[in-house]
């Protein structure tokens, strides 16, 4: 039976944290048997904001090493770097010419990012949803895992595909969203009102996958809760709800079992056990990470790019011909 193709992209712009893992990467690992997967390190997206070239290069390899340590299997899935497939920006230019300024000006992420970095706003930042559409459409993707913050961009991608097919002839598969029901939003430890983020400045905001046990214990001790002292899954109590959600995702226990276990215990006891569950969950990832060599990473990326290029080339050539380009 033909497996549906899934395209997933991740930027190499900072350390991978628990929110990335529980919200995306863990699901990617679990769906490798069910789908044909292409995992792409979207490094061209990373240059829409100021970034040191040496850091970008090292972070790209670092990210691949972590993805492998988390369980991405290059024998099952394609894993490659965006900039190694030339058709990504080439198709993006063709798509640029099919999208109105009005559609682009409605993109909320551009507004948010430009407010945070007003001195660094460039055309690439404004335009990157088109490159994202190119990433997806190049591979005739059936499904795209998206969080809440990327839904608008996938909708734009779908609109672009439908418009192109209507105006020039059938070329692109119109992708559907693949939204994880659980774990899609892990919030910051220091501020449970905001999503856990690589770019947040707080020292105790995020748990990173390579954090040492003593660092994890320290961060969890300082994690925000409330003054009620009752351990229960209540979405209105953002701090304890976030910690319980993390515990549930790492332990695979039901909310009922967790509440029963901590019924007569305080936040200190719960945080101590949460830190231990976290340490044990991250231990095998950290051990595998240490075993992966730079040469192994480069060989896997070469193989992934070799798999991706023919797919991308076929789509780009068809789009080019349909538009009358020689």
Swiss-Prot record:
It catalyses: tRNA(Trp) + L-tryptophan + ATP = L-tryptophyl-tRNA(Trp) + AMP + diphosphate + H(+). GO terms for molecular function: ATP binding; tryptophan-tRNA ligase activity. Its main location: cytoplasm. The keyword Protein biosynthesis applies. A motif ('KMSKS' region) lies at residues 195-199. Signal peptide: none annotated. Transmembrane segments: none annotated. This is Tryptophan--tRNA ligase. It comes from Helicobacter pylori (strain ATCC 700392 / 26695) (Campylobacter pylori). The lineage of its organism: Bacteria, Pseudomonadati, Campylobacterota, Epsilonproteobacteria, Campylobacterales.
């Amino acid at each position: 039976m033909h497996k549906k193709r899934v395209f997933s992209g991740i930027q190499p712009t900072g350390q991978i944290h628990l929110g990335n893992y529980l919200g995306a990467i863990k699901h990617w690992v679990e769906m490798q048997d069910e789908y044909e997967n292409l995992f792409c390190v979207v490094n061209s997206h990373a240059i829409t904001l100021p970034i040191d070239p040496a850091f970008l290069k090292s972070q790209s390899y670092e990210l691949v090493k972590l993805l492998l340590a988390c369980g991405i299997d290059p024998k099952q899935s394609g894993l490659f770097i965006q900039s190694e497939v030339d058709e990504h920006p080439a198709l993006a230019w063709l798509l640029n010419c099919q999208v109105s300024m009005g559609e682009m000006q409605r993109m909320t992420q551009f507004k948010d990012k430009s407010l945070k970095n007003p001195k660094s706003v460039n055309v690439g930042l404004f335009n990157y949803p088109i490159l994202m559409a190119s990433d997806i459409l190049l591979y005739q993707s059936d499904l795209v895992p998206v969080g809440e913050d990327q839904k608008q961009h996938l909708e734009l991608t779908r609109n672009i595909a439908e418009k192109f097919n209507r105006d020039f002839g059938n070329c692109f598969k119109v992708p559907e969203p693949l939204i994880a029901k659980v774990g899609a939003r892990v919030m910051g430890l220091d501020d449970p009102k905001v999503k856990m983020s690589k770019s947040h400045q707080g020292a105790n905001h995020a748990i990173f996958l390579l954090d040492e046990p003593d660092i994890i214990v320290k961060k969890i001790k300082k994690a925000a809760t409330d003054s009620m002292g009752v351990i229960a899954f209540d979405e209105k109590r953002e701090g304890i709800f976030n910690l319980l959600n993390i515990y549930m995702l790492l332990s695979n226990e039901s909310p009922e079992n967790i509440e029963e276990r901590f019924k007569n215990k305080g936040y200190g006891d719960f945080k101590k056990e949460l830190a231990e569950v976290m340490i044990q969950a991250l231990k095998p990832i950290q051990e595998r990470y240490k075993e992966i060599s730079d040469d192994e990473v480069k060989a896997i990326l070469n193989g992934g790019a070799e798999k991706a290029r023919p797919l991308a080339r076929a789509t780009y050539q068809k789009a080019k011909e349909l538009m009358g380009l020689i």
